[in-house]
A protein has these predicted regions:
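A short, N-terminal "cap"/entry segment at the start of jelly-roll beta-barrel domains
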Residues: 9-63
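Conserved short histidine dyad/triad with adjacent acidic residue
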Residues: 65-80, 116
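A short hydrophobic beta-strand segment most commonly corresponding to one strand
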Residues: 127-143
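Short beta-strand His + acidic residue motifs that chelate non-heme Fe in jelly-roll/DSBH
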Residues: 96-97, 119-126
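Active-site or metal-binding loop neighborhoods of secreted/extracellular toxin and effector enzymes
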Residues: 140-153
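Short, small-residue-biased leader/transition segments that mark boundaries at the very start
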Residues: 1-3
Length: 153
């Protein structure tokens, strides 16, 4: 039985995610892609729930989804994204490390705006599985190349 009002919010939220899953809007994202040299070691990294497009057309300027992050970024390296993005942490939090090796805690209600060229990594505290709203911006704005696996460049 829920004692606090927040319990009802969690129940409604979990029900909403189940509906998205039943509608085919859930995808398990692995911690490394098919092009990674050690793809055979891939494991689930986040559960992604698509609020707009399951497969966004490249011409459409944005997409919105919920990420339920399950594990740290793999390896020791940084990564970037093919588009600028906004992330809003709804619950939990994570450590974000940047190219300067600055490590900052990003907690509940944190809002981050990032360019497509931003290099970073995400690490979790034990027992914390953050949930974020992620707004992916338009493709084609990354000026640098894709990040290299296992590096800080």
């Amino acid at each position: 039985m829920c004692i606090r009002d927040s319990c009802y919010g969690i129940i409604i939220y979990m029900f909403f995610l189940r509906i998205l899953e039943k509608l085919g809007r859930k995808r398990v994202v692995m911690d490394r892609g098919l092009s990674h040299p050690e793809y055979n070691l891939a494991k689930p990294w986040t559960d992604r729930y698509y609020l707009l497009f399951r497969k966004r057309p490249k011409w459409f300027p944005f997409n919105i989804f919920i990420n339920h992050i399950k594990d740290n970024d793999h390896g020791i390296g940084l990564h970037n994204h093919p588009f600028p993005y906004i992330t809003i942490i709804l619950s939990g939090g994570y450590w974000e490390t940047n190219i300067k090796k600055e490590r900052k805690w990003r907690g509940k209600f944190y809002i981050g705006f990032r360019s497509a060229d931003n290099l970073h990594r995400v690490d979790l505290e034990p027992g914390i599985k953050p949930i974020t709203i992620y707004i992916a911006g338009p493709y084609g704005l990354r000026k640098k190349g894709r990040s290299e696996y296992g590096t800080w460049k």
